[in-house]
Amino acid sequence: GAKIRYDKRFQTIGGTNCNFVQQIDKYTIKIRTYERGVENETLSCGTGITASAIAYAHKNNLEIDNVAINAKGGNLKVFFNKDSQGNYNNVFLQGKAQEVFAGSIELFLE
């Protein structure tokens, strides 16, 4: 992941995130993500998972409206509609949510 993240082709934009996708079955993929800023593999990345699922569905001409995702952070589903021109819309990411932190901050406004 780091090798791609720092590749010179992405220097002008400050590097890139990198998603590795493996087909599990026709409608399920496994995704691992190396994230810029974190500089390591993360448990999950919503934008990377969504983009990977749409790219996978498009490349494989899937006739369904969702792709199942296995990520280190848990199992997810990406739902979408594909119109007659081949455009994807109404894209949703579904998965379990868990609060991992709560806090507050006091702002001093003048």
Range-by-range predicted roles:
Residues 1-44, 51-110:
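Active-site proximal loop and beta-alpha junction motif in alpha/beta enzyme cores
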